[in-house]
Design a protein with these regions (language model features):
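Hydrophobic/aromatic-enriched cytosolic interaction surfaces used to assemble or bind macromolecules
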Residues: 1-249
Length: 249
Protein backbone atom coordinates (compact mmCIF):
# COMPACT_ATOMS: atom_id res chain seq x y z
CA UNK A 1 0.00 0.00 0.00
CA UNK A 2 1.17 3.53 -0.79
CA UNK A 3 -0.27 6.96 -0.14
CA UNK A 4 -0.07 10.36 -1.78
CA UNK A 5 -0.55 11.90 -5.18
CA UNK A 6 2.86 10.99 -6.56
CA UNK A 7 1.88 7.34 -6.41
CA UNK A 8 -1.49 8.19 -7.93
CA UNK A 9 0.17 9.76 -10.96
CA UNK A 10 2.45 6.73 -11.32
CA UNK A 11 -0.53 4.39 -11.28
CA UNK A 12 -2.29 6.48 -13.91
CA UNK A 13 0.69 6.09 -16.21
CA UNK A 14 1.23 2.39 -15.57
CA UNK A 15 -2.36 1.18 -15.49
CA UNK A 16 -4.13 3.11 -18.22
CA UNK A 17 -5.36 -0.17 -19.71
CA UNK A 18 -6.61 -1.72 -16.47
CA UNK A 19 -9.96 -1.01 -14.90
CA UNK A 20 -9.83 1.49 -12.06
CA UNK A 21 -11.78 0.68 -8.91
CA UNK A 22 -12.51 3.22 -6.20
CA UNK A 23 -13.48 2.50 -2.61
CA UNK A 24 -15.14 5.43 -0.84
CA UNK A 25 -14.77 4.75 2.87
CA UNK A 26 -17.12 6.50 5.30
CA UNK A 27 -17.62 6.01 9.04
CA UNK A 28 -20.02 3.07 8.91
CA UNK A 29 -19.89 1.76 5.34
CA UNK A 30 -18.17 2.10 1.99
CA UNK A 31 -18.95 2.23 -1.72
CA UNK A 32 -17.08 0.28 -4.40
CA UNK A 33 -17.21 0.99 -8.12
CA UNK A 34 -16.06 3.12 -11.02
CA UNK A 35 -17.45 5.36 -13.77
CA UNK A 36 -20.69 6.19 -11.90
CA UNK A 37 -21.39 2.48 -11.20
CA UNK A 38 -21.03 2.09 -7.44
CA UNK A 39 -22.49 -0.30 -4.88
CA UNK A 40 -22.89 0.00 -1.12
CA UNK A 41 -20.96 -2.45 1.07
CA UNK A 42 -20.07 -3.14 4.67
CA UNK A 43 -17.27 -5.33 5.99
CA UNK A 44 -19.52 -8.41 6.23
CA UNK A 45 -20.75 -8.16 2.64
CA UNK A 46 -17.33 -7.47 1.12
CA UNK A 47 -15.27 -10.17 -0.62
CA UNK A 48 -12.11 -10.28 -2.74
CA UNK A 49 -14.24 -10.98 -5.83
CA UNK A 50 -15.53 -7.41 -5.61
CA UNK A 51 -12.03 -6.17 -6.55
CA UNK A 52 -10.92 -8.02 -9.68
CA UNK A 53 -8.27 -5.44 -10.60
CA UNK A 54 -4.87 -4.23 -9.46
CA UNK A 55 -5.83 -0.55 -9.81
CA UNK A 56 -7.60 0.19 -6.50
CA UNK A 57 -7.86 3.57 -4.76
CA UNK A 58 -9.34 4.05 -1.28
CA UNK A 59 -10.73 7.55 -0.70
CA UNK A 60 -11.23 8.41 2.97
CA UNK A 61 -14.18 10.52 4.15
CA UNK A 62 -14.06 9.74 7.86
CA UNK A 63 -13.31 13.25 9.15
CA UNK A 64 -12.45 16.62 7.59
CA UNK A 65 -8.70 17.01 7.06
CA UNK A 66 -6.35 19.77 8.16
CA UNK A 67 -4.52 21.74 5.46
CA UNK A 68 -0.88 22.58 6.16
CA UNK A 69 1.22 24.81 3.85
CA UNK A 70 4.35 23.13 2.55
CA UNK A 71 6.71 25.54 4.32
CA UNK A 72 5.09 24.82 7.70
CA UNK A 73 4.75 21.06 7.39
CA UNK A 74 6.66 18.87 9.85
CA UNK A 75 5.96 15.16 9.65
CA UNK A 76 6.47 14.64 13.39
CA UNK A 77 3.62 17.09 14.10
CA UNK A 78 0.82 15.14 12.36
CA UNK A 79 -1.10 14.44 15.57
CA UNK A 80 -0.66 18.03 16.71
CA UNK A 81 -2.16 19.40 13.50
CA UNK A 82 -5.31 17.34 13.95
CA UNK A 83 -5.68 17.71 17.72
CA UNK A 84 -6.07 21.47 17.33
CA UNK A 85 -9.33 20.79 15.45
CA UNK A 86 -10.78 17.74 17.19
CA UNK A 87 -9.99 14.95 19.61
CA UNK A 88 -8.04 12.12 18.02
CA UNK A 89 -9.68 8.69 17.88
CA UNK A 90 -7.93 5.67 19.36
CA UNK A 91 -9.16 3.35 16.60
CA UNK A 92 -8.04 5.55 13.71
CA UNK A 93 -4.59 6.23 12.29
CA UNK A 94 -3.16 9.53 11.07
CA UNK A 95 -1.98 9.92 7.49
CA UNK A 96 -1.17 12.70 5.03
CA UNK A 97 -1.09 13.47 1.30
CA UNK A 98 1.20 15.84 -0.57
CA UNK A 99 -0.40 17.60 -3.54
CA UNK A 100 1.18 17.27 -6.96
CA UNK A 101 2.10 20.97 -7.00
CA UNK A 102 3.78 20.46 -3.59
CA UNK A 103 2.12 23.56 -2.14
CA UNK A 104 0.12 21.95 0.65
CA UNK A 105 -0.17 18.81 2.74
CA UNK A 106 -3.50 17.26 3.70
CA UNK A 107 -3.42 15.64 7.15
CA UNK A 108 -6.27 13.36 8.19
CA UNK A 109 -7.47 10.42 10.26
CA UNK A 110 -8.46 7.24 8.50
CA UNK A 111 -9.86 3.80 9.23
CA UNK A 112 -7.49 0.87 8.83
CA UNK A 113 -9.95 -2.04 8.86
CA UNK A 114 -10.52 -2.13 5.12
CA UNK A 115 -6.84 -1.59 4.35
CA UNK A 116 -5.98 -4.50 6.65
CA UNK A 117 -8.37 -6.77 4.75
CA UNK A 118 -6.92 -5.75 1.38
CA UNK A 119 -3.38 -6.35 2.59
CA UNK A 120 -4.32 -9.84 3.83
CA UNK A 121 -5.91 -10.61 0.48
CA UNK A 122 -2.79 -9.45 -1.35
CA UNK A 123 -4.59 -6.61 -3.15
CA UNK A 124 -2.42 -3.60 -3.94
CA UNK A 125 -4.03 -0.21 -3.42
CA UNK A 126 -3.36 3.44 -2.80
CA UNK A 127 -4.99 5.49 -0.06
CA UNK A 128 -5.95 9.17 -0.25
CA UNK A 129 -8.17 11.77 1.42
CA UNK A 130 -11.31 13.06 -0.29
CA UNK A 131 -10.17 16.69 -0.12
CA UNK A 132 -6.94 15.81 -1.91
CA UNK A 133 -9.06 14.48 -4.78
CA UNK A 134 -11.15 17.67 -4.86
CA UNK A 135 -8.06 19.88 -4.74
CA UNK A 136 -6.38 18.01 -7.60
CA UNK A 137 -9.60 18.25 -9.61
CA UNK A 138 -10.26 21.97 -9.02
CA UNK A 139 -6.75 23.43 -9.16
CA UNK A 140 -6.21 22.96 -12.94
CA UNK A 141 -9.66 24.35 -13.84
CA UNK A 142 -9.69 27.72 -15.58
CA UNK A 143 -10.90 30.39 -13.15
CA UNK A 144 -12.11 33.62 -14.74
CA UNK A 145 -13.34 35.30 -11.56
CA UNK A 146 -11.25 37.15 -9.00
CA UNK A 147 -12.63 34.82 -6.33
CA UNK A 148 -14.00 31.34 -7.08
CA UNK A 149 -16.27 29.64 -4.55
CA UNK A 150 -16.77 25.86 -4.80
CA UNK A 151 -19.21 23.84 -2.70
CA UNK A 152 -19.34 20.09 -2.27
CA UNK A 153 -22.69 19.21 -0.66
CA UNK A 154 -22.78 15.93 1.25
CA UNK A 155 -25.35 14.02 3.25
CA UNK A 156 -25.07 15.95 6.53
CA UNK A 157 -22.16 18.23 5.70
CA UNK A 158 -20.81 20.52 3.04
CA UNK A 159 -17.32 21.64 2.06
CA UNK A 160 -16.39 25.14 0.93
CA UNK A 161 -13.26 25.67 -1.16
CA UNK A 162 -12.11 29.15 -2.23
CA UNK A 163 -9.53 30.21 -4.81
CA UNK A 164 -8.21 33.69 -5.50
CA UNK A 165 -7.83 33.30 -9.26
CA UNK A 166 -5.53 30.25 -9.39
CA UNK A 167 -4.32 30.45 -5.80
CA UNK A 168 -5.93 28.16 -3.23
CA UNK A 169 -7.10 30.22 -0.24
CA UNK A 170 -9.51 28.36 1.99
CA UNK A 171 -11.15 25.07 2.86
CA UNK A 172 -13.61 24.21 5.61
CA UNK A 173 -16.38 21.75 6.36
CA UNK A 174 -19.68 22.65 8.04
CA UNK A 175 -22.57 20.65 9.41
CA UNK A 176 -25.96 21.34 7.89
CA UNK A 177 -29.44 20.41 9.07
CA UNK A 178 -31.40 22.38 6.49
CA UNK A 179 -31.08 24.93 3.70
CA UNK A 180 -31.27 27.85 6.13
CA UNK A 181 -28.29 26.62 8.15
CA UNK A 182 -26.41 25.93 4.92
CA UNK A 183 -26.95 29.48 3.65
CA UNK A 184 -26.03 30.96 7.02
CA UNK A 185 -22.57 29.36 6.97
CA UNK A 186 -22.09 30.17 3.30
CA UNK A 187 -22.86 33.86 3.85
CA UNK A 188 -20.67 33.85 6.95
CA UNK A 189 -17.67 32.64 4.94
CA UNK A 190 -18.33 35.08 2.10
CA UNK A 191 -18.54 37.95 4.56
CA UNK A 192 -15.17 36.98 6.07
CA UNK A 193 -13.62 37.16 2.61
CA UNK A 194 -15.47 40.41 1.85
CA UNK A 195 -17.20 38.80 -1.10
CA UNK A 196 -20.50 40.22 -2.32
CA UNK A 197 -22.93 37.32 -2.65
CA UNK A 198 -24.92 39.22 -5.28
CA UNK A 199 -21.93 39.41 -7.62
CA UNK A 200 -20.12 36.18 -6.67
CA UNK A 201 -20.83 32.96 -8.55
CA UNK A 202 -21.36 29.85 -6.44
CA UNK A 203 -19.90 26.75 -8.09
CA UNK A 204 -21.60 23.57 -6.91
CA UNK A 205 -19.76 20.30 -7.46
CA UNK A 206 -22.43 18.35 -9.30
CA UNK A 207 -26.19 18.78 -9.44
CA UNK A 208 -28.22 16.20 -7.52
CA UNK A 209 -31.95 15.85 -6.99
CA UNK A 210 -31.64 15.40 -3.21
CA UNK A 211 -30.07 18.86 -2.85
CA UNK A 212 -32.53 20.73 -5.08
CA UNK A 213 -33.87 22.87 -2.25
CA UNK A 214 -30.32 24.01 -1.44
CA UNK A 215 -29.72 25.05 -5.04
CA UNK A 216 -33.07 26.83 -5.26
CA UNK A 217 -32.55 28.65 -1.97
CA UNK A 218 -29.02 29.76 -2.86
CA UNK A 219 -30.16 30.91 -6.31
CA UNK A 220 -32.30 33.56 -4.62
CA UNK A 221 -29.08 35.29 -3.56
CA UNK A 222 -26.38 34.33 -6.06
CA UNK A 223 -25.69 33.05 -9.55
CA UNK A 224 -25.12 29.29 -9.61
CA UNK A 225 -22.75 27.21 -11.72
CA UNK A 226 -22.72 23.41 -11.72
CA UNK A 227 -19.41 21.62 -12.16
CA UNK A 228 -19.37 18.24 -13.94
CA UNK A 229 -23.10 17.36 -13.66
CA UNK A 230 -24.98 20.02 -15.64
CA UNK A 231 -28.24 18.08 -15.51
CA UNK A 232 -29.85 16.98 -12.28
CA UNK A 233 -28.70 13.51 -11.24
CA UNK A 234 -30.50 11.04 -8.99
CA UNK A 235 -28.32 9.50 -6.29
CA UNK A 236 -30.03 6.10 -6.20
CA UNK A 237 -27.55 4.43 -3.84
CA UNK A 238 -27.63 7.28 -1.30
CA UNK A 239 -23.92 7.98 -1.61
CA UNK A 240 -22.90 10.33 1.20
CA UNK A 241 -20.83 12.55 -1.12
CA UNK A 242 -22.45 12.04 -4.54
CA UNK A 243 -20.05 14.20 -6.56
CA UNK A 244 -17.55 11.36 -6.18
CA UNK A 245 -19.83 9.09 -8.19
CA UNK A 246 -18.19 10.80 -11.18
CA UNK A 247 -14.90 8.95 -10.55
CA UNK A 248 -12.92 12.18 -10.82
CA UNK A 249 -9.46 10.84 -9.92
Amino acid sequence: METGLQFLMQKRNKNNSSKKIEIHQFKSNFFIGSESDFKLFNLKSFSKDDLNTENVTIIHFNKPPVIVPNKLFIKDNLNKYLSTNYELSNNLSVSYDETTNKLIYIVYEKKNNLETILNKKGIEFMSINYFTVIYEYLTPLKKNDEMSIYINIRNRLFDIIIYNKDEFLYFNTFNKKNKEEFLYYLLYVLKNFQADVNSTKINFLGKFEEFKEYYDYTSLYAELVYIKNNTQTINNIKHESPFFLNSII
